[in-house]
Design a protein with these regions (language model features):
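Short acidic loop-to-beta-strand element that houses the catalytic metal-binding Asp/Glu
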Residues: 119, 179-182
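C-terminal active-site "lid" helix and adjoining low-complexity regulatory extension at the edge
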Residues: 171-174, 183-229
Length: 229
């Protein structure tokens, strides 16, 4: 962050805005989105681990499977899918992993296994393209690094509407943004994560996406530098 602050205070233009970078570093931005009206995957937030937290989360979420992950992490690092039994078996490991480390506990959304995770990509709040990632058999993680299958999609109109609503809640306007969603048990699309810090944009999945990105970047620079079009 010190380097980013130095860049922001220099003549260089930091993209996205430093305020957005700071805000999105920790997954607690999901709480802010929820307060602003976004539907997120239900989340319980904790600053440190204690023996009863995980077991109580099963009851709180009304589920037999939960996901626990650090508030600051990437690529599903230190992310666990837990049943009650596995939570007991891994009690010592979980205590060590999340000792004095903020984390979030969410219900496992089973649709992720078959329906996958939907990602919408925006340049200056305008939707560019969309993808779907489905975990490999026997896994729950949707990252390519873990073997997930990535495809380009034409997003469902309801997903497009939900995505536009979520992105409108981000302030200031990001030059680029990726919004990840999962379909909840009731069919609604729920926000899993926002990616505002150099995310994988999968420009290769849409032949027009690189051009859209370049045009959006040009517009962003001119707007923030006061350059006439």
């Amino acid at each position: 962050m010190a380097l980013l602050t130095e860049i922001d205070q220099s003549r260089a233009l930091l993209v996205n805005d430093l305020a957005l970078v700071r805000w999105s570093l920790a997954k607690t931005y999901l709480r802010d989105l929820q307060r602003r009206g976004a539907a997120i995957v239900p989340s319980l937030w904790h600053d440190k681990m204690s023996p009863d937290i995980i077991q109580s989360a099963f009851a709180a979420h009304g589920t037999d499977r939960v996901i626990i992950k650090p508030v600051v992490s990437t690529n599903a690092t230190n992310t666990y899918l837990l049943t009650r039994e596995r939570a007991v078996a891994l009690e010592s490991e979980l205590a060590e992993t999340f000792r004095d480390r903020p984390f979030v506990v969410q219900p496992f959304i089973a649709n992720i296994l078959t329906d996958g995770e939907y990602s919408l990509f925006y340049f200056n709040r305008t939707l560019s393209h969309a993808t779907r990632k489905v975990p490999k058999p026997g896994d729950f993680r949707v990252q390519e690094e873990h073997g997930a299958e990535l495809t380009s999609i034409e997003p469902d109109p309801a997903l497009v509407e939900t995505g536009a609503s979520v992105v409108s809640l981000i302030d200031p306007t990001p030059m680029y943004a990726r919004a990840d969603f999962v379909r909840g048990p009731d069919g609604r699309f729920l926000v899993m994560e926002l990616e505002l810090i150099e995310p994988s944009m999968y420009l290769r999945m849409d032949g027009q996406a690189p051009g859209r990105f370049a045009e959006a970047f040009d517009h962003y620079v001119k707007e923030h530098r006061g350059v006439s079009a």
